[in-house]
Amino acid sequence: MKVYFIGQKGIPAKFGGVEKHVEELVTRLVKAGHEVFVYTRPNYTDRKLKKYRGVNLISLNNLATKHLDAISHTFRACLDLTKRDADIVHFHSIGPSSLIWLAKLLKPGVPIITTFHTKCYEHKKWGAFARLCLKIGESVACRLADKVIAISVPPLKL
């Protein structure tokens, strides 16, 4: 099965839970016999690196700014999918998952999975407009994804 991963900065993981999670998942999928492709950002993964532990890396340029980094890279990855023979597309994080509609439009019939790692809109680094966009993106992704995975549980308040 050909599985494409969108939304992470890249692998190998240098820091961050999303990248570590993706690296663990994709290398296990390769060991299970699947053909795996990870879209990477050149400001995170060296674009000369084409393969890592059996995983195919696809480096795409993006607008490397606080507000446009993830969404511009995700947009490019969705467009790139039109050239690919994907069996499954797996998005990671709320921001990138807001473009699931585009992947569904460009690759009809291909199952889309999304993994939410955290409620990004609760992070203090985002302003009101960015938080609104992330909340809308979360809602859209939950409605359009074929499967939704949540790997975090909110901490209990005692």
Q: For each predicted feature, which ranges?
A:
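An aromatic- and histidine-rich active-site surface loop
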Residues: 71-80, 86-116, 120-121
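Residues at the starts of beta-strands that form the adenosine-phosphate
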Residues: 2, 35-37, 111, 146-147
